[in-house]
């Protein structure tokens, strides 16, 4: 039963297939997630499961959260996350139960959510891949300027969504349809083909793929 799991990005490496091909993989360290609460349609209006992962010193846990963890009978974690589940899956879960990497298997396709690396305030060339203007031929100040951002008196404004300079990165991002290459249950590791959002050590959420791409689709 694959619901999802919260882990930490440990870095990237590569593994070799039986025929010697090199496959780049991201290593996700996912210690057992502890169920802290089960959402039910009768009480909450939907079915879901709330989990915590990792650990946190008692003096760093607020009293409300300490009581929440104590009521579930689990050790305090570094945060809480929630997964939507079907009514049937919710029945099989209860507070205190653990979710491990063994809920996934090699060859399975997953979606991974994380917070992308923050790049600070970036211009349009770096942020949106705009082409630069001429280096010479009368251009002396606008080499990396975006150019026109609108029209004239009509409409007399800049349209929403216009690609301009601004904060780059540090946003919640999801990469879809990544293949699980290997599951190491002994060391609580998931090896996923390709790269995932975020810096090394950041939290990532691994879920079964919602819209799995079939072979041959472009």
From Swiss-Prot:
Quaternary state and interactors: Part of the 50S ribosomal subunit. Forms a cluster with proteins L14 and L19.
UniProt function note: One of the primary rRNA binding proteins, it binds directly near the 3'-end of the 23S rRNA, where it nucleates assembly of the 50S subunit.
Keyword terms of this UniProt record: Methylation, Ribonucleoprotein, Ribosomal protein, RNA-binding, rRNA-binding
Keyword 4Fe-4S appears in the UniProt entry: no
GO terms under cellular component: cytosolic large ribosomal subunit
Recorded family membership: Belongs to the universal ribosomal protein uL3 family.
GO MF: rRNA binding; structural constituent of ribosome
PROSITE patterns named in the record: RIBOSOMAL_L3
Stored Pfam families: Ribosomal_L3 (PF00297)
Stated name of the protein: Large ribosomal subunit protein uL3
Post-translational modification: Methylated by PrmB.
Entry-annotated residues carrying N5-methylglutamine: 153
UniProt lineage: Bacteria, Pseudomonadati, Pseudomonadota, Gammaproteobacteria, Chromatiales
Keyword Metal-binding: no
Gene: rplC
SUPFAM superfamilies the record matches: Translation proteins (SSF50447)
Source species: Alkalilimnicola ehrlichii (strain ATCC BAA-1101 / DSM 17681 / MLHE-1)
InterPro entries the record matches: Ribosomal_uL3, Ribosomal_uL3_bac/org-type, Ribosomal_uL3_CS, Transl_B-barrel_sf
GO biological process, alphabetically ordered: translation
């Amino acid at each position: 039963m694959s619901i999802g799991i919260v882990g930490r990005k440990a870095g990237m490496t590569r593994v070799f297939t039986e025929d010697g091909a090199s496959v780049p993989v991201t290593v996700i360290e996912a210690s057992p997630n502890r169920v802290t609460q089960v959402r039910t349609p009768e009480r909450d209006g939907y079915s879901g499961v709330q989990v915590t992962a990792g650990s946190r010193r008692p003096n760093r846990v607020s009293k409300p959260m300490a009581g929440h963890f104590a009521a579930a009978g689990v050790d305090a974690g570094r945060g809480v996350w929630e997964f939507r589940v079907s009514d049937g899956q919710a029945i099989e879960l209860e507070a205190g139960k653990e979710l491990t990497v063994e809920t996934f298997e090699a060859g399975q396709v997953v979606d991974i959510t994380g917070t992308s690396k923050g790049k600070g305030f970036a211009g349009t060339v770096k942020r949106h891949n705009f082409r630069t203007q001429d280096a010479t031929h009368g251009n002396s100040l606008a080499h990396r300027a975006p150019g026109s951002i609108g029209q004239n008196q009509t409409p007399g404004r800049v349209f929403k969504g216009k690609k301009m300079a601004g904060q780059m990165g540090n946003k919640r991002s999801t990469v879809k349809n990544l293949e699980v290459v290997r599951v190491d249950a002994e060391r609580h590791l998931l090896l996923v083909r390709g790269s995932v959002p975020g810096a090394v050590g950041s939290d990532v959420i691994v879920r079964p793929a919602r819209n799995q791409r079939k072979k041959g689709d472009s």
